[in-house]
């Protein structure tokens, strides 16, 4: 099995590439694994990379090194490929996906020794207009807050939480809150505002 670290260099408040390279090298050395590191270059690149690799049919474990966006992109790239598995190394701003594993999970995911031979558990995916979501699909104000948090993330004055709170404030104070939406769930259509 190949172990590929997909690193989003834009994730988080600090450059964590060296930390990931060190983890990958340790796995290669300590366990004689086939390990490779790849950097993403733009939005959607992780999806394209992982899909192309998964399409070869070779067994592969991807390490999503970034935040929730990187995790989401890799999930979209490997969806439908039983030869591909994913775990994550949380170096993003929010890392909300990890909250599904308990409040004390993050340190476990920051140590690749815990991840390289872990059990693979299938996840149901949420299909949202042809794009998959893992455990949550946000709409309206919540989605706008998540999208604009990155505008504040570049500020050296704000932490990850500070960026989130700034985004909440701006979206509640300066943007319209209500929007019309339509959801299809198990062939039932629901429309509302």
Which ranges hold each PLM region?
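Short glycine-/acidic-enriched loop or helix-start segments at secondary-structure transitions
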Residues: 16, 73-75, 98-100
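Catalytic core of DAGKc-family lipid kinases
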Residues: 40, 80-193
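Short Gly/Thr/Asp-enriched flexible loops that form oxyanion-binding sites at enzyme active sites
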Residues: 70-82
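Short alpha-helical
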Residues: 44-45, 69, 140
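A glycine-rich beta-strand to alpha-helix segment
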Residues: 60-65, 69-70
């Amino acid at each position: 099995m190949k172990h590929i670290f997909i690193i989003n260099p834009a994730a988080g408040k600090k450059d964590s590439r060296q930390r990931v390279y060190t983890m990958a090298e340790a796995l290669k050395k300590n366990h004689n694994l086939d390990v490779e590191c790849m950097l993403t270059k733009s939005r959607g690149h992780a999806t394209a990379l992982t899909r192309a690799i998964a399409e070869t049919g070779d067994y592969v474990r991807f390490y999503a090194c970034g935040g929730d966006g990187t995790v989401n992109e890799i999930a979209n790239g490997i969806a439908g490929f039983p030869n591909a598995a994913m775990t994550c190394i949380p170096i993003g701003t929010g890392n909300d996906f990890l909250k599904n594993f308990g409040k004390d999970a993050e340190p476990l995911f920051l140590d690749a020794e815990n991840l390289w031979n872990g059990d693979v558990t299938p996840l149901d995916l949420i299909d949202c207009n042809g794009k998959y979501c893992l455990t949550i699909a946000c709409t309206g104000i919540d989605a706008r807050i998540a999208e604009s948090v990155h505008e504040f993330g570049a500020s050296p004055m704000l932490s990850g939480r500070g960026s989130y709170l700034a985004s909440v404030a701006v979206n509640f104070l300066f943007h319209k809150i209500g929007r019309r939406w339509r959801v299809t769930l198990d062939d039932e259509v629901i429309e509302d505002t």
